[in-house]
Each structure stands twice: as structure tokens, then as C-alpha cells.
Amino acid sequence: MVQHLTAEEIIQYISDAKKSTPIKVYLNGNFEGITYPESFKVFGSEQSKVIFCEADDWKPFYETYGSQFEDIEIEMDRRNSAIPLKDLTNTNARIEPGAFIREQAIIEDGAVVMMGATINIGAVVGEGTMIDMNATLGGRATTGKNVHVGAGAVLAGVIEPPSASPVIIEDDVLIGANAVILEGVRVGKGAIVAAGAIVTQDVPAGTVVAGTPAKVIKQASEVQDTKKEIVAALRKLND
């Protein structure tokens, strides 16, 4: 199983990161004689521009040239952000629109991350693992191979306090919709966590747990194969 950043390394990374407030500015007006800072990315025509820049760089620019603008619309979706979204260019996985995956998360080959899922810094999505809609992998939460994390499920993150142990999900585990796995819990290979369960302690390999708090109710071997099947076709990428 892939191991990634320690809590201390993540804390240092966030502390040292240059905080960013990127904005997108739509402008109509007279742009004659305007000089744009090198940090600006400018697109458009003679009478209309779209500018990508930092909020701190926009302020002095606007103070200088604002009288030349007729219409202004500014989009801002974060403030003093320390962690950008992950560059997925070289990620060999299926990532659907609306998934939020932060830098320093690991997405292994053949994984699937569905709409609305959130993968925080330091989290690991194992090979062939599916993170279903609106599920959350908190900081440093780690899944093995061929895991299914159901819609709305939460694997608790542990960056603060840094002494806490991360959630570890071993290979071939099924986690039902809206289940919650608390920090420090390890779910053993081939286990099944029922929908809505709240897991507060380690789950033995090959067992089924359910309830609040979750308790072992039977063995995974007693569950019909069709109810615990991992479908390879859903993880298939282009040939």
C-alpha cells in the first residue's frame, strides 16, 4: 500500500506555501494606453477583456486604470488558499466533473473518482478503487486496491492534531453509502462496512460490520458474490 506525507510534512507544506487569491475579471471599456503587469493573463478584443490575476495585483491596476472601464465583473472562489487542486494531466484514472482533488493527493492507476467527491491533501486512492459521489477522503486517508467507497461516505482526515493516525482501508473493502470511518481506524482486507455505519474501531479482515457504533454482524464470505462484486468494466480506460 502506498504511503505518503506525514502530518508534519503536510503542516510544513501548508505553512510554507504562498497563499493565493486568484480572480477572474471581465471588463468592457477603453483599453488604449493600458500596460498590463507580467503576472496578468489577458484575453479578449479591443473593447472587452478577461483577466486572470491575483487579487493583490488587481487592486493597484484598478486604481490606475479603473476610470477607463465601463463594466466590471469579478469572480473569486477562494481566499488565501494554500493548496491548489491537483494537476491531473498525467493521472491514469477516471476522474468525473465536479470532483475536488487537492495537490499532494495520490490517485493510482485505474481508480475512479465520481462527481462531488473530495480527496484532501495527503490522501491516497488505491489502484482500481472507486470513490463514489460526494464521498470524502480526509487528509492522509488511504485506500488499498479495488476498494469501493460508497456515495456520501467519509474517511476522516488527520492533519490536526498531527499525532493522530490516518484511516487505512486495505484491499478489496466495500464501504456502504454514508458510512463514517473515524480517524485511526484500519479496515481489514475484504471487509464490508454497511451503509450508514459509524466505525470507531478496527474492522477485522473478511468481516461485515454495521450499526452505530459499528459491530461485526457476520463474515463477508456469507454475503452473496453479486452483492460485493467489483466491476472491472467501470474502471476501464481507453485502449
Swiss-Prot record:
The keyword RNA-binding does not apply. Pathway: Amino-acid biosynthesis; L-lysine biosynthesis via DAP pathway; LL-2,6-diaminopimelate from (S)-tetrahydrodipicolinate (acetylase route): step 1/3. GO terms for biological process: diaminopimelate biosynthetic process; lysine biosynthetic process via diaminopimelate. PROSITE patterns: HEXAPEP_TRANSFERASES. Keywords: Acyltransferase, Amino-acid biosynthesis, Diaminopimelate biosynthesis, Lysine biosynthesis, Repeat, Transferase. It is an enzyme of class 2 (transferase). It catalyses: (S)-2,3,4,5-tetrahydrodipicolinate + acetyl-CoA + H2O = L-2-acetamido-6-oxoheptanedioate + CoA. Pfam families: DapH_N, Hexapep, Hexapep_2. GO terms for molecular function: tetrahydrodipicolinate N-acetyltransferase activity. The keyword Amino-acid biosynthesis applies. Its EC number is 2.3.1.89. SUPFAM superfamilies: Trimeric LpxA-like enzymes. InterPro entries: DapH (IPR019873), DapH_N (IPR013710), Hexapep (IPR001451), Hexapep_transf_CS (IPR018357), Trans_hexapeptide_repeat (IPR050179), Trimer_LpxA-like_sf (IPR011004). Catalyzes the transfer of an acetyl group from acetyl-CoA to tetrahydrodipicolinate. PANTHER family: 2,3,4,5-TETRAHYDROPYRIDINE-2,6-DICARBOXYLATE N-ACETYLTRANSFERASE, ACETYLTRANSFERASE. Belongs to the transferase hexapeptide repeat family. DapH subfamily. This is 2,3,4,5-tetrahydropyridine-2,6-dicarboxylate N-acetyltransferase. It comes from Staphylococcus aureus (strain bovine RF122 / ET3-1). The lineage of its organism: Bacteria, Bacillati, Bacillota, Bacilli, Bacillales.
